[in-house]
Structure formats: C-alpha cells, structure tokens
C-alpha cells in the first residue's frame, strides 16, 4: 500500500499543519499522496490535486483527517470502488475513526508494514418511489431517516416489511438504521445499541404519539417500505444526516441492505464497549455542565 488519498475537513482547527506533516512523512517513506483538487488548492498543495474520480480509482487507501462525519461522507463516496478507509480523529470521541493525533506516525508505520486488518460494515440503500417510478437512490452507512420539518404538524406513515403491513404511525418520523447507526440518531430516539459486526436492521419511531410503538430489530435481508400518508409541512428523507431529499404525500421510501459494504482499516482490536461507555459518559458530563 503506497498510494494514499487524503481527505481533509478544512473546518477543523490547525488541520493544514497536521495535513502538511502527514504528507511530508508519507512522501519521505516513498508513498504517493492524492487529494481532491479544491482541497489541495485550499492547502496550497495544488500539485497533489486530482479529479474526484481519479482519486477514488487510484488510491489504495483513503486517509481521512477529520471526525466521524467526514469519515461517513468518505465511506459513501468510495463504497462502489471497495477502497478501504482509515480515519485520523480531529473531532470529539469517534466510533469510526481509528487513529488519535498523538499516535499518527506510529500508526502510519503499522499501515505501511501491513500490520492491519479490514473490517466491513453493512450499508443501507434507500429509494424514493413517486407515482410508480424511482426518483432518487441514496446510500448510507448509519441510517435512513424520514422526518418532518421543524414547523410541520404531526405526520402519518404506513410501514411494511417484506410487503407485510406492520403499522401506521403518527410520529415525527421513522429511523431505519444499520448496526453502525445504532449508536447515532436511533440511540437518541430510544433504539437499542447493536455491536457493529452484526448484520441486521433497526426500525425506531421518532416521538410516536402512541405508547405501543416500539423499536424493532429485523433480518438484514428485509425490505422496509414506508408510505408517506400525510403531513402538515415539509417531510424529508436524509441519509447519515448529510444527504437529503424532499418527500411528497404518497411517496414511498424503500430501504434495504446495500450490495456494497463499507471497508475500514483497523490497526488494533477495538473495544466497542469502552468507546461506547466513554461516549455515554461524555454526554452525561456535558449534560451536567448545562445544569
């Protein structure tokens, strides 16, 4: 592995200095570094810039400098090529990023020496069907979320699993999540935590107006269909909280397991529950700080 695609979140503090150090280290160690043209120009490194398609085709590994959000975006972009991704964390505690800043160069040395393994994660595909025709197709790693806008009235959704009627929900929305997404929006809405090596789908209603509406765990090969019955205002489909599509009354959203899988480079055995505990404790401490 000696051709790296470097993806940089330019909004992170001191990212230009960190990126420069990483690029110099990789080049000194005989590696080639590629970046998106716009990012390369922003960092004063236009010589490294290539078109997006060339970046994905030529890079043997995508090295992401940012947080989990940047890693999610990159994982979706490269899923079709099967390019593995590894993240250097510049954000808060991350579930997906692998390397912390103090460990950057020892970790890169392990990577060059082949001391790593590939962890695959299930992804989701969502299609919007409007008047019998597919009008949008989206790919996600965490979740597909159907939700009303901030000022919209209660919405009504009819849900089917494998063409079998499940229920009609009066709710703020519905989350269909992967195991990776179980610790994201679904968790905040009362869904269960699922370890990421499993293949399954989670369905979590958002603020349902009935006490009996509860989260569900279903088989990974299930096909979930949500019919938008009515709603007073804007209703959106969002994937991973980053890519959205506006829905209309009578639209159908069909969610299934994607054919492609996200591929993450791991340098060490990950203790999922330690990371989970730290995240939950961090949220608790933040809540105390607002009292």
Curated annotation (Swiss-Prot):
One MF annotation (Gene Ontology) recorded for this entry: metal ion binding
Keyword annotations of the record: ATP-binding, Cytoplasm, Kinase, NAD, NADP, Nucleotide-binding, Transferase
Listed GO biological process terms: NAD metabolic process; NADP biosynthetic process
Necessary cofactors: a divalent metal cation
Subcellular location: Cytoplasm
GO cellular component, one term: cytoplasm
Residues the entry annotates as binding NAD(+): 68-69, 73, 142-143, 153, 172, 183-188, 242
InterPro entries associated with the record: ATP-NAD_kinase_N, ATP-NAD_kinase_PpnK-typ_C, NAD/diacylglycerol_kinase_sf, NADK
Reactions mediated catalytically: NAD(+) + ATP = ADP + NADP(+) + H(+)
Keyword Kinase belongs to the record: yes
SUPFAM superfamilies: NAD kinase/diacylglycerol kinase-like (SSF111331)
EC numbers on record: 2.7.1.23
Source organism superkingdom: Bacteria
Signal peptide: none
Active-site residues (renumbered): 68 (proton acceptor)
Record Pfam families: NAD_kinase (PF01513), NAD_kinase_C (PF20143)
HAMAP family given in the database record: NAD_kinase (MF_00361)
Function: Involved in the regulation of the intracellular balance of NAD and NADP, and is a key enzyme in the biosynthesis of NADP. Catalyzes specifically the phosphorylation on 2'-hydroxyl of the adenosine moiety of NAD to yield NADP.
Family listed: Belongs to the NAD kinase family.
Protein name: NAD kinase
